[in-house]
Amino acid sequence: MPKYYEDKPQGGACAGLKEDLGACLLQSDCVVQEGKSPRQCLKEGYCNSLKYAFFECKRSVLDNRARFRGRKGY
């Protein structure tokens, strides 16, 4: 599922997860067929696994213990 490419510049912490979450939302049936905004679809429960992974990645940036272990995600 990850769409990480080596030729892309590294945008920052959790950039790959953020990009994949946006792509997942834009390709979901909620946005394509129903015409809702990605924010509404995210609240309705689409792409939950990527949403959780992005949350954990952002949380690990602030967690001092996780700073030594490395960020979760890609």
Swiss-Prot record:
GO terms for cellular component: mitochondrial inner membrane; mitochondrion. Residues 27-65 form the CHCH domain. The keyword Transcription does not apply. Keywords: Disease variant, Disulfide bond, Phosphoprotein, Primary mitochondrial disease. Coiled coil: none annotated. A motif (Cx9C motif) lies at residues 47-57. This is Cytochrome c oxidase assembly factor 5. It comes from Homo sapiens (Human).
